Amino acid sequence: MTQGPGGRAAPEPEAPTTFCALLPRMPQWKFAAPGSFLGRGPAATRVAGVAEAQPEPGVPALAAVLGACEPRCAAPCPLPALGRCRGSGTRGARVTPDVADEWVRKGGFIHKPAHGWLHPDARVLGPGVSYIVRYMGCIEVLRSMRSLDFNTRTQVTREAINRLHEAVPGVRGSWKKKAPNKALASILGKSNLRFAGMSISVNISVDGLNLSVPATRQIIANHHMQSISFASGGDTDMTDYVAYVAKDPINQRACHILECCEGLAQSVISTVGQAFELRFKQYLHSPPKAVVPPERLTGLEELAWGDDDAAADHNYYNSIPGKEPPLGGLVDSRLAVTQPCALATLGGLGQGMTPVWRDARGLPWDMGPSGAAPPGDGYVQADARGPHDYEEHLYVNTQGLDAVELEDTAEAPLQFEDSPKKDLFDMRPFEDALKLHACSVAAGITAASPPLEDQWPSPPTRRAPIAPTEEQLRQEPWYHGRMSRRAAEKLLRADGDFLVRDSVTNPGQYVLTGMHAGQPKHLLLVDPEGVVRTKDVLFESISHLIDYHLKNGLPIVAAESELHLRGVVSREP
């Protein structure tokens, strides 16, 4: 230590410290900047004053507010002042236990600039600090930055700059062209050059980084602070560039490159560091509350497959003394409940009107004065949708059913409440009636004509579904009657073992349970139309389906998987 002219000890020169050393306890958040951060000295204030300067008369408001070192700005960066600020360096600080505790308790950086941050905390906590930079595009990052060491992360950002520097025309930043790094070919993916080469505004605050077009205020990207995993800028070999890796819904995980005028990159990366420190302090003051998972989530197997007998654990209103039943009574699971606003509209039309509920096809169902829908009988009917199977998402051969239902919903027109009680889901009589009615009006037919419903053609005959009976299935050794999913899986020992059971949650729905590649599979055997079928073949009955695949040694193919039937799991006598 040497005494200065004013009796004050002059600081000892130290080697530059990378920004990553400031975050020893946050491995997923690292910054790289070998020079020191700009302090709040007079020189540094003049450099960064563009973000805090008051608008002068005659100077465009945009340049005064966003003030940065884009060549079109009114005042360029004072390079001598920037050099003095860089030369001043950051006062060294040893990592002692007290300083480490300071980071944990208050969220302060260990190697914080001696003169403080570049901007007031209130500015970063509030509207943020804006800079005018040139956006160079982004490159997809295929691997998580947490899985890479710090040197590899730095190489990723430099390789991204190296690729975009050649692809984007009109770049002015200082960059030495390097040979492509083949070792990073598996980490970096495709590039996105949309908005590349445009002058944009980057706003930095505790909320994150917001990239927008200054003239039109169009948002290019908005990266929250917690989505940014790495930032680097202002190094000796990338003095004019800032690179950061963040995730967003458009580009997924990508490395975004910003080109700054000379000296501005250090200001940008310093402001990002300040925003991160303030955000971390906010986290320390109000950490998120621990969420206790429900007991049902304790077992992954239970979550994945569900429990058919879970309904027995619920407390129903008719088993609790004094408990009133819910309003509305039983609601058929085939009916889609309308929005409350729809019922309010009906109520406004007349106080004496009966609520009408419509199913997925838009057909009316009279609920009656009590609002109770007719309960389903639990079996699949010929011309109506069967009750919703709550295990449907757990089966491997039901992926195409939702698409068929959506098609039918989109194509089926709306019927009126006074429609004849014919085939409800046959739309052709309704269409024919509309055509006949239009012709009648055009021809001037009077009310003496026969009733309209008598002129409707009869619905076409449709093949009745094959509904297997309990007596027929009881004759087969592989049929076990009503059985839960878990109980059926316990009976399977080897690949090819199979049985057929009646669903517990949806009586009348028959399920084939078998073992394939050590995993149990569950296939629905009767489709919503009541037909026994596989993906490509229709069968006369469940027994026909089982015998066909068992005798011919053919697998049942469903949802890109197959199930072989080799060993019959016989039911207990």
UniProtKB/Swiss-Prot annotation:
Pfam families: PID, SH2. Interacts with the Trk receptors in a phosphotyrosine-dependent manner and MEGF12. Once activated, binds to GRB2. Residues 478-569 form the SH2 domain. Transmembrane segments: none annotated. One of its GO terms (biological process) is intracellular signal transduction. Signal peptide: none annotated. Phosphorylated on tyrosine by the Trk receptors. Keywords: Phosphoprotein, SH2 domain. Expressed in brain. Expressed at high level in the hypothalamus and at low level in the caudate nucleus. Signaling adapter that couples activated growth factor receptors to signaling pathway in neurons. Involved in the signal transduction pathways of neurotrophin-activated Trk receptors in cortical neurons. The modification Phosphotyrosine is found at Y316, Y317, Y395. Residues 310-477 are annotated as: CH1. This is SHC-transforming protein 2. The PID domain mediates binding to the TrkA receptor. Gene3D superfamilies: Pleckstrin-homology domain (PH domain)/Phosphotyrosine-binding domain (PTB) (2.30.29.30), SH2 domain (3.30.505.10). The gene is Shc2. Residues 125-309 form the PID domain.
